[in-house]
Amino acid sequence: MVFSRFFRVTGVNLSRRVYSRISSSSSPSLESIPWIHKASNFTLYGSFHASSVETQVSANDASQDAERICKILTKFTDSKVETLLNEASVKLSPALIEEVLKKLSNAGVLALSVFKWAENQKGFKHTTSNYNALIESLGKIKQFKLIWSLVDDMKAKKLLSKETFALISRRYARARKVKEAIGAFHKMEEFGFKMESSDFNRMLDTLSKSRNVGDAQKVFDKMKKKRFEPDIKSYTILLEGWGQELNLLRVDEVNREMKDEGFEPDVVAYGIIINAHCKAKKYEEAIRFFNEMEQRNCKPSPHIFCSLINGLGSEKKLNDALEFFERSKSSGFPLEAPTYNALVGAYCWSQRMEDAYKTVDEMRLKGVGPNARTYDIILHHLIRMQRSKEAYEVYQTMSCEPTVSTYEIMVRMFCNKERLDMAIKIWDEMKGKGVLPGMHMFSSLITALCHENKLDEACEYFNEMLDVGIRPPGHMFSRLKQTLLDEGRKDKVTDLVVKMDRLRKTQLVG
């Protein structure tokens, strides 16, 4: 059986802290759950979850030290951040701080603390990349006043770049502040930069990718041939934006205008058009554009094959998906992980898990994976098919490091199964590796804790969420407040509301 070849036997040890946390809860202990106990006897070509792996040395010292710092910072609720960092005993460098700030991109308050700590170390100077990483993190919690203060600081230190303004614009756009997003690009001229066609395209791209393609189209129509001459990239950005909205009528209009202006679709434009039709489930049209591209001697890219395999596979048109996979093999491009992942997904949609596992074996033989995305696809489909036992086995035996997305899938699965002890076990594994949870993972766990009436624990995680600077979604906060009120804990609700208002209104100080 292919599934049995997918694994080899090993033992999996629980840390004493995690085990005591699970066994002390009202739920049964880990060993009392038959399918989980069985699952712990498998591993996939070397597990990254066993405690012995923690002694492995990373090839990149900065990356290794950054991971260690993030692990230390998960304890920040018990100590001051500065104290923890002073005790970290790492070799400080701009590259290290940049790596840490990127890992803290979902924790703006922590990121700012690390930035300020490094700045106060003797002889240390931040780079443009460090500032940009902090701006990205602060933008996620809408600390725009502080961000512009950092821009002034960068200007004084001659560290400003056009990338800085693009980052700020993107954060405004994702906060649905379209006027400010456009203004951020124009503001670069106030700081001595000349706005060029590439910046115009970047503005369009920022708006389009934040689901504001209508505004991007207005900017395009207003500015074309007045300040900027659009090029084929300008049109492909709009094609992609309208494609994301599944507005094929506008995709067709932009395509026609592009041709009228003398720009024939290139492989990028065709890829976007084909992907848009696949997402809209217009597969005959997608294939028609594919054939048109080949007739024009425009060679399909691996991305185009991925779009078709993904789309056809999701509609359980497995034979058609397999045909395009075979065509991709003979296209002249080496097969890469995304193409294999598309095939894995196609098999999963048709519930042919044996073939999905065979594909993973082939990826390994070819040296192109599997990667975390491969496992995320398999886990998603196993959970969709109510095969939780198998999903946990696959998770335990991953041959690469899980990403925050992988952890989120597993935490959500156990929350939905009302196995909070296991959800918290996965959570602790993740934080033990220096990976910080995002908003959706906090929301899943807190909502599940409310459902189980574990309100003290729910409040504990809610406070942790606020402490790192993550704003909770409204529906989750409402659920927590109502559950507390139902239990007569009005004082606790008042405390949380005050803390939420403080996070919402308080501007961090740089």
Swiss-Prot record:
GO cellular component term of the entry, any: mitochondrion
Coiled-coil parts of chain: none
Pfam families: PPR, PPR_2
Subcellular location: Mitochondrion
PPR repeat residue numbers: 127-157, 161-195, 196-230, 231-265, 266-300, 301-335, 336-370, 371-401, 403-437, 438-472
Location of the transit peptide in the chain: 1-14
The UniProt record lists the keyword Transit peptide: yes
Keyword field: Mitochondrion, Repeat, Transit peptide
Family: Belongs to the PPR family. P subfamily.
NCBIfam families in the cross-refs: PPR
UniProt-recorded name of the protein: Pentatricopeptide repeat-containing protein At1g71060, mitochondrial
Organism name: Arabidopsis thaliana
